[in-house]
Amino acid sequence: MSFTRQLTKNLTSFKVLAPFAAAVGSVGIAYQYSTSSIMNETGKTFTGNDEWIDLKLAKSWDTTHNTKHFVFELANQDDVSGLINASCLLTKFVTPKGNNVIRPYTPISDVDGKGSIEFVIKKYDGGKMSSHIHDLKPNDTLAFKGPVVKWKWEPNQYKSIALIGGGTGITPLYQLMHEITKNPEDKTKVNLFYGNLTEKDILIKKELDTIAEKHKDQVNVVYFLDKAPENWNGETGYISKEFLQSKLPGPGKDNKVFVCGPPGLYKALSGPKKSPTDQGEVEGALADLGYTKENVFKF
């Protein structure tokens, strides 16, 4: 069963699956929908039920050559989305032939933010949903449903975490980093290792750099580029086993590694998920360094 079909099936049936390890739920482990805590609460747009909700596009702008930042309005200015960290929403549109196209997207806006919800979305060649969203104009609507909880973050769950991402995989990792650093009581150390093809492909770099600058004693961000310019002051090439070995404390109950990115990144560093509900064993560089599925979570 495909990723989005599995998500839709679980939302439709209201099933709450058991957590794996410390997680309350996840796209890669188990889809737990926080219906009990948010159902019927006023001011929350998404409550985990089977209702598709149309949101109006307020504005959008280009952030890279193939990526846009989108702001969708909630029904009321005092409403919040109802999402938690880290969670995503399903999106849907109907083709001229009557076929449903459904895809998940992770917001980058603060879950406590009022009145709107924001996404950074890359347009892929042949991507039906990403192309549709990129074609939206202000006041056009898009159908959303959720939330789909991927990992429920609790402050100080770990002494340190590593966020390893590539391309658009940055969005759930940014969610976690933002959630941790906005809470002065959360002392979790954060290492973000983020790979892209070129400098212009780096998503939400301004936001990442702002957090890193503001929280120098807590957050470390390292960028990797396959094709780096001459004046590049980050890393060049792929995120390697040797690099991870030099930067990570090693597997243990006090730290966790979160991975999100394209198939090649999973293959090289953590191994792929077996299915949307099965994380599978850890493979690749992290396995070589002694990490197991208790130490690694794959978005």
Swiss-Prot record:
Enzyme class: oxidoreductase
Cellular component annotations (GO), alphabetically ordered: mitochondrial outer membrane
Compartment list: Mitochondrion outer membrane
InterPro entries reported in the protein's UniProt record: CBR-like (IPR001834), Cbr1-like_FAD-bd_dom (IPR008333), FAD-bd_FR_type (IPR017927), Flavoprot_Pyr_Nucl_cyt_Rdtase (IPR001709), FNR_nucleotide-bd (IPR039261), OxRdtase_FAD/NAD-bd (IPR001433), Riboflavin_synthase-like_b-brl (IPR017938)
Membrane association type: Single-pass membrane protein
Catalytic activity: 2 Fe(III)-[cytochrome b5] + NADH = 2 Fe(II)-[cytochrome b5] + NAD(+) + H(+)
SUPFAM superfamilies referenced in this protein's UniProt entry, alphabetically: Ferredoxin reductase-like, C-terminal NADP-linked domain, Riboflavin synthase domain-like
Keyword Mitochondrion attached: yes
Family membership: Belongs to the flavoprotein pyridine nucleotide cytochrome reductase family.
Function: May mediate the reduction of outer membrane cytochrome b5.
Protein name, per record: NADH-cytochrome b5 reductase 2
Organism the protein comes from: Debaryomyces hansenii (strain ATCC 36239 / CBS 767 / BCRC 21394 / JCM 1990 / NBRC 0083 / IGC 2968)
